[in-house]
């Protein structure tokens, strides 16, 4: 009998609840934490959107498209009904981060900026950066097409020179792609993983990115490998996660791309159809800010 991939996530949560080290953290909430975890999710004919609770699929999709656009303005995402970056872009949060001179919503040179304009001088979220810095994402796609056996198929959001200007340094900071047998796989290194809220989102987001890059390069999705550094459960998520652990995984949904897309910048939210997603009910959890 094949074990459902979702059990890897659930088993990590169990391990943290049973044996995690009690640690303080930036938010003041406190965590239980373990260091070093790996899980592998097959993308063949399925999409790893967790089923033991409902995951906000539209939020996953819109956030990734926002990254791909190179945007650093949380207001742009919020206007699409996705509020997941609102707290980190608030006037109060920016002031506490030493960035009180910024307009609310200006997150600094975070994920999308590093993916599309690595090395450019950051001014603000309204500036047009076209032609500035290294477009890692476009270069990555081109290299997969030209040299699929390359060991340099890397995309990074971690730029030490820019960290002080970011509202929040990247948690999911580096991924590497790998081509074999006509399939594209992706391995993500995540320095900090919030098991209750963030990690289910991150699994889906990088799996979606793998589907998109595979589509553009004429490959099939293979595996998503997720490596976590500090894997933690916030103390106010312990009881909600205990509820989640009582539930059995259901079949993963399938993801279809509905039209032929030729350029990474041409993807739209309506290009994706998630089919057969029948999860357990949502479990409310407060985000630690």
Curated annotation (Swiss-Prot):
Family annotation (InterPro entries): Thymidate_synth/dCMP_Mease, Thymidate_synth/dCMP_Mease_dom, Thymidate_synth/dCMP_Mease_sf, Thymidylate_synthase, Thymidylate_synthase_AS
Per the record, what are the reactions this protein catalyses?
dUMP + (6R)-5,10-methylene-5,6,7,8-tetrahydrofolate = 7,8-dihydrofolate + dTMP
SUPFAM superfamilies annotated for this entry?
Thymidylate synthase/dCMP hydroxymethylase
Where in the sequence is the active site?
Answer: 171
EC number in record = 2.1.1.45
Q: Which Pfam family, any one of them, does this sequence belong to?
A: Thymidylat_synt
Which NCBIfam families does the record cross-reference, listed alphabetically?
PRK01827.1-3, thym_sym
Is the Calcium keyword given for this protein?
no
Subunit and interaction comment: Homodimer.
* UniProt cross-references to PROSITE patterns, sorted A to Z: THYMIDYLATE_SYNTHASE (PS00091)
State if Transferase is listed as a keyword. yes
Q: Tell me which UniProt keywords the record has, alphabetically.
A: Methyltransferase, Nucleotide biosynthesis, Transferase
**In which residues is (6R)-5,10-methylene-5,6,7,8-tetrahydrofolate bound?**
194, 288
Q: In which pathway does it act?
A: Pyrimidine metabolism; dTTP biosynthesis
Positions bound to dUMP: 26, 151-152, 191-194, 202, 232-234
Question: Any idea what this protein is called?
Answer: Thymidylate synthase
Which top EC class is named for this enzyme in its record?
Answer: transferase
């Amino acid at each position: 009998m094949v074990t459902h991939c979702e059990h890897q996530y659930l088993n990590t949560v169990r391990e943290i609840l049973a044996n995690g080290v009690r640690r303080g953290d930036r938010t003041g909430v406190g965590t239980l934490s373990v260091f070093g975890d790996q899980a592998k999710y097959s993308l063949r004919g399925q999409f790893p959107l967790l089923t033991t609770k409902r995951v906000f699929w539209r939020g996953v999709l819109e956030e990734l498209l926002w990254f791909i656009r190179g945007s650093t303005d949380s207001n742009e995402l919020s206007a699409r009904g996705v509020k997941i970056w609102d707290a980190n872009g608030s006037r109060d949060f920016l002031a506490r981060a030493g960035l009180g001179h910024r307009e609310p919503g200006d997150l600094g040179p975070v994920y999308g900026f590093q993916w599309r304009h690595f090395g450019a001088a950051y001014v603000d979220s309204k500036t047009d950066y076209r032609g500035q810095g290294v477009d890692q994402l476009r270069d990555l796609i081109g290299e997969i097409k030209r040299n699929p056996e390359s060991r340099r198929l890397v995309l990074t959001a971690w730029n030490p020179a820019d960290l002080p200007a970011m509202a929040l340094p990247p948690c999911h900071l580096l991924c590497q792609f790998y081509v074999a047998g006509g399939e594209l796989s992706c391995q993500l290194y995540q320095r900090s993983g919030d098991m209750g809220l963030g990690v289910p989102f991150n699994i889906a987001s990088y799996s979606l990115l793998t589907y998109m890059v595979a589509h553009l390069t004429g490959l099939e999705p293979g595996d998503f490998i997720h490596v976590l550094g500090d894997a933690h459960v916030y103390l106010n998520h312990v009881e909600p996660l205990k509820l989640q652990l009582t539930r059995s995984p259901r079949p993963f949904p399938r993801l279809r791309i509905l039209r032929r897309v030729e350029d990474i910048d041409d993807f739209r939210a309506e290009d994706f159809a998630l089919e057969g997603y029948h999860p357990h009910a949502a479990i409310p959890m407060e985000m630690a800010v």
